[in-house]
UniProtKB/Swiss-Prot annotation:
Gene3D superfamilies: Leucine-rich Repeat Variant, Transferase(Phosphotransferase) domain 1. It holds the Pfam family Pkinase. One of its GO terms (molecular function) is protein serine/threonine kinase activity. This is Probable serine/threonine-protein kinase DDB_G0278901. Belongs to the protein kinase superfamily. Ser/Thr protein kinase family. Residues 404-419 have a biased composition (Polar residues). Its cofactor is Mg(2+). The active site is at 147 (proton acceptor). One of its GO terms (cellular component) is cytoplasm. Residues 319-403, 476-515, 594-646, 1325-1372 have a biased composition (Low complexity). Its EC number is 2.7.11.1. Keywords: ATP-binding, Kinase, Magnesium, Metal-binding, Nucleotide-binding, Serine/threonine-protein kinase, Transferase. It comes from Dictyostelium discoideum.
Length: 1495
């Protein structure tokens, strides 16, 4: 049975798709340009990645795809780098093209973070350093990748990063000004701004994408990933830089800011970023650059700090006492003793013996040490455990040695755990002695399992073996560890002297402390790299001679240059003191400061070479090496102490001293060469070997020469050192006597003065005036490094703090879990209240741990979901309290306030309040907890407490809960609105006395505002309908009336209620303080400050009696309530109908009336008033609502706000809203117009018209409607309305409506109007009505007298020369002014106006209504105006009306008043019209008029 299955499997493999010699097995990736397969070679059996690209059938697309494909292949062919995926071959076919590349086993970093989670910053540093190496190589080759992201970064099993997917890559050489590559290529979220704007591409766009990739590795998504691609592209271009993720180090933040510079010209390049401290921190974390420390002391110090943290945690937080709770471990249990650390006197003796033998025969000891280490590691391998699972999940390169701890620590470095008290950490650092070790070793017997280094491969052992042999020469009796370094692989192995004994099974903890993962396999060295290795050996050989200038412990701190013979040195220094300071003084200074650190391994290699080349001098060399190593060890110890105590300020001082000049000062501010430099500067020196090439060319001879040739060059070396180190403008301090120092200083001062005089006397040469430019790449590299010198990196200190913070977090989590386990329904109320208060305080201090409420296990303790238990307890107590009214609960509490025990009802109330506080504290900005509460039906349980039968404090906590639901999660908001009748709950919360508990009302208003701002499942119109049915508008209008229109009686009662409420809360505060003192609680609950919740009112609860701060707060929420009303007023007719109920509008009217009575109305009140007036305006626009507004009495307050009010600033805006509302309300409704007249609308209306502002356009239609349809005209006469209408005749825009209103008024009150038009005086309607009979009898005589007076005083004026005045005339008119105004309608400038035809009809009616008026018009030149209009006008309609006016003149007796000249011109124009006009009607009328004139 097994053979057929095997054959079937083989057949399946054979049946796979193939291309050339490869089988396409599995799909490992898909993209926009093709599919990537995992391929298997048919004959050789190795795997490869094969990219399959389909060839387009269309010729145009086929050519474009072929060009891009060949471009990618040509790029891959020429690229050869360790961090770039390797290209094998190209296999074309008829339908597809196949690119065969190197297969990377673990896939991309994108898959890694999706599969295993986010990467810590320490691991990201390792990977990005390799990406930068690959990018630097690409950019050096002139290649732009253009698609750097995590999906295109492949990771192999040894941790190497490979750049892949060169489908959109291009070469810089292909770009030019004539052919720039402005194509929109790449992935949107990783694109640089210049690519999005199509401004041309450069290598800087890859640096931007690299910064986005770092954020992707740290957070899981690139910047702006939550937005749509188009929106993300807009954000990239508009904002200064993408958002920097929180919780990262300062070095990484600076690195990202260098990547995200908008200007690509100033953006850092990949070569520059390789020198950034964040990238260099990969090598700083390598143990080879750290000073050796006492491992035992470090472990004891760390454990003592943990003990102190645990004790501090236990003292601050009182843990519950329950047998069901798992007790926390004791300090002795939490800090177990170390295994294999039995240090006795015999072991010390063995160590000393082994060390002494090591100094005599170094090579043998090194070999045995290696064997013993490997054997010890193998023997104890089964006993040791891995420190973290990250090593099994991710391939970690050898350069990262502290990622194990940082995988846990880095996400919480900047979180709430940074609040761990630093004094508690630092108190026990220096308090460790042997007694503490004995106490730990005599503990409970638990053992700490120390991880050993992973087993090395054979090739790795061979690469490490030569260094182990070389490192054996440095083994001394004063050191406990020896470190060997492989320069090619950066691998560090640590051995102990006690492990050299083959019979000993002791494993040193230092091995595990400094153990590293396996190194990255390196490629064979090229011939150029081999020559570089030889140069490095030569430089290291010269370091032996530089040791003579190192400082001893007994020397002065600033005397770093030690010369064996001072007189000889002076003779050698005198001829060279005139040299200028070297350019790379700072690097040489750092080199000398770290001479002892960097020479330990180089001396060993030098000695081994001498042993192989010269056997005669073997013993001498060994002795010299031992002596040198002993001095080196002492110097290393001193250096390690100084490194631990130094900071970044000394490094900055060394940098700045290079640019200072102090000739006359003789203190410590001169240029010094201090040995005590920080880790950053030492790291910098160890990574500047390439920058030292030009300096080492002058040092020593080649490695093949003998020591005799080296000895002959000592003088040259000393002189070269002096040239490089000693500037001519600095005072050098020697380690000789004081007299010698004074002589040297005087000599140097003389030399400086002579040089300055010579320099001033000699003119500058042209060569000296030229700008000096750096010529070598090493000088530029140094410039890159110095640009990042301000950024410090202290990895060791941060790591210790992070570890202690993690331990502190574990203790807090245990405490929270213990409290959660006590939340049980069967517990007494006092215990539950105390537990809720403690959990609330803990969650407030440590908000990150609130997620424990929705987890069912932590630290091996599995329990029920805590949020379910809390809701059950809350529901049980809600059922108990639902039958007890709030006034009964308050009374019970009031009578028992002096007793030591609570009643059962009040204990339930207090428990409910504390449970709600715990829930409110846990859901702040926590969407997961909110959604979990929604799923557990928690909303309905909690919102039952919103009704008025429960206590105000309970309802206040419910309002806070509702506000949190509406603030952050759309899901919880939808569940609250649609599934739990949220609209009804919010209205219930508003049903409260504002001045007794406005916090819950404020929360409710905030929640309602947020509901309409967030995206909900229901449309906004449906939400408006839901709220309208729940009487929300009534509650808000009643609330506003309660705030602004409180009566004295209600105010007094509310004040008394508030005082009782305040006394109740103070008593509750005292009882809570007593409980806290008994339980030794330091934190006060949120209810401990009642004075901040409610205003203190003395006489009245009106808003006018509040203080300024309280008034501003109340007014702010009043504006928010007005905003809600304004939003509903813009709804459809159904919402407006619900909103226009009489019980809603009447409260709004009361608010308007109350505010109008205030003497001063500030800007804040004015903004509120504007919103309320806008609400009425929006409602008045609906015809179905106007009658309801009228019934509610809206018109009088609106008219009040049209009047002048001295206390309102910028009253024009108020007039605008009120006038709009009146316009819609008074439109075509005579009854409402009558009400408006009775409310004295005319006076403010005429005032607005006289101001000639923009509101005039709204006021005039209202005035015309009042004139045309009003029955109570006595008010019109009282306000001289007709005079205003006569003024409007001269207004070009309103002359037609004005003459029409006058004509309509004349039809209703013809006698009074014509008397006004004929006399020009102001006539009282009452007087005219009482004397109407006498006036009618004497009308002929009066008319004749008026006509005679007009003839005697009038002057003839041509109508063609009449100009319309722009300013309004006086209210009292003379007799001849009114005819002139009426004749002005016939101005030829009005003929083309659209209202001209409309205006001449009422003029014709006025002429026919009064012969006296006609005579006055004829005397003022009516005939001339008619002739001009008939000649110009071409409209038959208006011409017919003009001919009718002409007929009235011809047929009336007033024709005799027309002179002969006017008659002739009239006859002439009528004759022309009768013959030439196009209209037959016009011709006929003109012919009849001609006949009349002929008679």
């Amino acid at each position: 049975m097994s053979q057929p299955s095997l054959l079937n499997q083989l057949n399946n493999i054979v049946d796979k798709e193939s291309c050339g010699d490869y089988l396409l097995i599995d799909i490992i990736g898909k993209g926009g340009f093709g599919v990537v397969y995992k391929g298997l070679h048919k004959t050789k059996g190795y795997f490869s990645a094969i990219k399959k690209i389909k060839i387009m059938k269309k010729k145009k697309l086929q050519s474009e795809s072929q060009i891009s494909l060949m471009a990618e292949i040509n790029l891959l062919k020429v690229l050869s780098h360790h961090n770039i995926v390797r290209y094998y071959e190209h296999i074309p076919s008829s339908s597809h093209s196949y690119i065969v590349m190197e297969f990377i086993e673990n896939g991309s970093l994108e898959k890694i973070i999706k599969r295993h989670g986010l990467l810590p910053e320490s691991l990201v540093t390792v990977y990005i350093a390799q990406v930068l190496n690959g990018l630097e190589y690409l950019h050096r080759q002139g290649v732009i990748h253009r698609d750097i992201k995590a999906a295109n970064l492949l990771i192999s099993t040894d941790g190497s990063i490979k750049l892949a997917d060169f489908g959109v890559a291009t070469k810089v050489s292909d770009l030019s000004s004539d052919n720039p590559d402005d194509t929109f290529a790449g992935t949107p979220y990783w694109m640089a701004p210049e690519v999005i704007q199509m401004q041309g591409i450069s290598t800087a766009c890859d640096v931007w994408s690299l910064g986005c990739t770092i954020i992707e590795l740290l957070t899981g998504t690139p910047p702006y990933f939550g937005l749509a691609p188009a929106a993300a592209l807009y954000k990239i271009v508009q904002e200064d830089h993408p958002p920097i993720p929180p919780g990262i180090s300062a070095a990484l933040k600076d690195f990202l800011l260098n990547c995200f510079k908008k200007d690509e010209n100033i953006r850092s390049s990949a070569k520059q970023l390789l020198h950034h401290p964040w990238v260099k921190s990969v090598q700083i974390r390598n143990p080879e650059t750290q000073a050796p420390k006492n491992a035992r002391q470090e472990i004891l110090s760390y454990n003592a700090q943990l003990q102190d943290i645990i004790q501090d945690n236990n003292s601050n937080i009182t843990r519950p006492r329950s047998s069901a709770v798992v007790q926390p471990p004791s300090p002795s249990q939490l800090v177990p003793p170390l295994t294999n650390m039995n240090i006795s006197s015999s072991n010390d003796n063995n160590n000393n013996n082994n060390n002494s033998s090591a100094t005599n025969n170094s090579p043998n000891i090194s070999s045995t040490t290696t064997k013993n280490n490997s054997s010890t590691t193998n023997n104890n391998n089964n006993k040791l455990t891995s420190p973290s699972l990250s090593s099994s999940l991710l391939p970690i390169p050898a350069t990262s040695t502290s990622t194990v701890n940082q995988n846990k620590a880095s996400p919480t470095l900047n979180s709430s755990w940074s609040a761990v008290p630093s004094n508690k950490i630092s108190q026990t650092v220096n308090s460790i002695d042997k007694s503490s070790l004995n106490k730990i070793n005599n503990g409970s017997g638990q053992h700490v399992q120390i991880a050993s280094p992973r087993k090395l491969s054979a090739g790795q052992k061979q690469s490490i073996q030569p260094n182990i042999i070389a490192a054996a020469a440095t083994t001394t009796t004063t050191t406990t560890t020896t470190t060997t370094t492989n320069a090619a692989t950066n691998t560090t192995t640590t051995t102990t002297p006690s492990s050299t004994n083959t019979g000993s099974n002791v494993t040193s903890p230092v091995v595990s402390a400094i153990s590293t993962p396996p190194p990255i396999p390196t490629t064979p060295l090229s011939p150029m790299m081999k020559s570089q290795e030889q140069l490095n050996q030569e430089k290291e050989k010269i370091n032996l001679h530089l040791r003579k200038f190192s400082e001893k412990e007994s020397d002065d701190e600033f005397d770093n240059i030690v010369l064996p013979n001072s007189t000889i040195c002076l003779q050698k220094l005198q001829p060279i003191l005139s040299h200028k300071p070297p350019i790379q003084l700072q690097r040489q200074q750092s080199f000398n400061a770290n001479n002892n650190i960097s020479n330990s391994n180089s001396n060993n290699n030098n000695n081994n070479n001498n042993n192989n080349n010269n056997n005669n001098n073997n013993n001498n060399n060994n002795n010299n090496s031992n002596n040198n190593n002993s001095s080196n060890n002492s110097n290393n110890n001193s250096n390690s102490n100084s490194i631990n105590s130094s900071n970044s300020h000394k490094l900055k001082l060394l940098k700045f001293n290079k640019f200072t000049e102090k000739d006359n000062e003789d203190d410590e501010t001169d240029l010094v060469f201090d040995q005590k430099v920080s880790d950053t500067s030492r790291f910098k020196v160890r990574n500047q070997k390439k920058d030292w090439d030009d300096e080492f060319d002058n040092f020593g001879s080649s490695g093949d020469e003998s020591e005799s040739s080296t000895a002959t060059t000592n003088a040259a070396i000393n002189s070269n050192i002096a040239k490089k180190i000693l500037p001519s403008n600095r005072i050098i301090r020697y380690s000789s006597s004081g007299q010698l120092k004074q002589q040297q200083q005087q000599l140097l001062l003389q030399q400086q003065q002579q040089q300055q005089q010579q320099h001033l006397q000699q003119p500058l040469s042209p060569s000296e005036m030229k700008l000096k430019v750096k010529e070598t790449s090493e000088e530029w590299d140094t410039e890159f490094e110095e640009s990042f010198d301000t950024i410090s990196w202290s990895e060791a200190d941060n790591q210790r703090t992070i570890n202690i913070q993690d331990k502190y977090r574990e203790q807090v989590v245990k405490t929270i879990v213990e409290f959660i386990l006590q939340l049980k329904p069967n517990q007494p109320n006092d215990v539950l209240i105390d537990t809720c208060q403690k959990l609330t305080d803990l969650f407030q201090t440590y908000p990150d741990e609130r997620k424990l409420l929705i987890s069912n296990g932590e630290g091996g303790v599995y329990f029920r979901l805590p949020i379910i238990t809390i809701l059950e307890i809350l529901e049980d107590n809600c059922c108990c309290n639902s039958d007890t009214p709030s006034d009964v609960i308050t009374t019970t509490y009031h009578h028992n306030n002096n007793s030591d025990t609570f009643s059962e009802d009040f204990s339930n109330v207090e428990l409910v309040i504390n449970l709600l506080k715990l829930l409110n504290q846990s859901i702040i900005k926590e969407k997961d907890i909110q959604e979990t509460i929604c799923l557990m039906n928690g909303i309905s349980i909690i919102t039952k407490l919103a009704t008025k039968q429960f206590d105000e404090l309970i309802r206040e906590e419910v309002s806070k809960f509702v506000l949190q639901l509406c603030s952050y999660s759309t899901y919880s908001l939808n569940m609250f609105i649609t599934g739990s009748r949220g609209c009804k709950v919010l209205v219930d919360l508003l049903d409260s006395d504002y001045f007794n508990g406005f916090t819950l009302i404020h929360n409710s208003l905030d929640a309602i505002s947020l509901i309409f701002k967030m995206n909900t499942a229901s449309p906004k119109t449906a939400l408006c309908h839901l709220f309208a049915k729940t009487a929300l508008m009534y509650r808000i209008s009643y609330l506003l009336n309660q705030i602004f229109n409180s009566s004295d009686k209600s105010a007094t009662s509310k004040s008394q209620q508030f005082q009782q409420k305040q006394i109740q809360q103070q008593q509750q505060l005292l009882l809570q303080q007593q409980q806290q003192q008994q339980q030794q609680q330091q934190l006060l609950p949120s209810s401990s400050s009642p004075n901040l919740k409610f205003p203190v009112l003395s006489k009245s609860s009106s808003v006018k009696n509040l203080s300024k701060d309280q008034f501003d707060k109340v007014l702010a929420y009043s504006v928010k309530a007005a905003d809600i009303l304004l939003f509903f007023s813009t709804g459809d007719s159904l919402v407006k109908e619900e909103m226009s109920q009489s019980n809603v509008i009447k409260y709004i009217v009361n608010v308007l009336d109350e505010i109008y009575t205030w003497k001063t109305i500030g800007n804040n009140i004015r903004s509120f008033l504007l919103k309320i007036l806008k609400v009425i305006k929006n409602l008045s626009m609906d015809p179905n609502v106007r009658s309801r507004l009228d019934d509610a009495g809206v018109i009088p307050p609106l008219i009040n706000y049209l009047k002048k009010h001295g206390g309102i600033d910028k009253i024009t805006e108020i007039h605008n809203q009120a006038l709009h509302s009146l316009y819609y309300l008074l439109l075509l409704d005579r009854s409402r117009q009558e009400k408006a007249l009775k409310s004295s609308i005319l006076e403010p209306l005429l005032t607005i018209i006289e101001e000639r502002g923009p509101l005039k356009e709204l006021a005039l239609p209202i005035l015309f409607d009042l004139v045309r349809s009003c029955n109570n005209r006595s008010l019109l006469w009282k306000c001289n309305t007709i005079d205003k209408l006569l003024d409007l005749i001269e207004d070009r825009n309103w002359f037609a409506d004005a003459i029409e209103s006058i004509s309509t008024w004349a039809t209703l009150e013809s006698k009074l109007v014509f008397e006004k038009l004929n006399s020009g005086g102001t006539i009282s309607p009452l007087t005219s009505t009482s004397t109407s009979t006498s006036t009618s009898k004497s009308s002929p005589s009066s008319s004749s007298s008026s006509s005679s007076s007009s003839l005697s005083t009038s002057t003839s004026t041509s109508s063609s020369s009449l100009q319309l005045p722009t300013s309004s005339s006086s209210t009292s008119f003379e007799n001849h002014n009114i005819p002139l105004r009426l004749i002005g309608i016939l101005n030829i400038n009005h003929i083309k106006h659209p209202s001209f035809q409309k205006s001449i009809i009422p003029l014709f009616n006025l002429i026919n209504g009064s012969q006296q008026l006609l005579k006055s018009l004829i005397n003022e030149g009516l005939v001339n105006s008619l002739v001009e209009c008939l000649r110009v006008d071409s409209s038959p309609v208006s011409k017919i009306t003009l001919l009718k006016i002409t007929a009235s003149i011809v047929q009336s007796p007033s024709l005799l008043l027309v002179d002969k000249e006017q008659t002739n011109s009239l006859y002439q124009i009528l004759n022309e019209i009768s013959k030439q006009d196009e209209s037959e009607i016009v011709k006929k009328i003109a012919e009849n008029l001609v006949l009349e004139l002929n008679k």
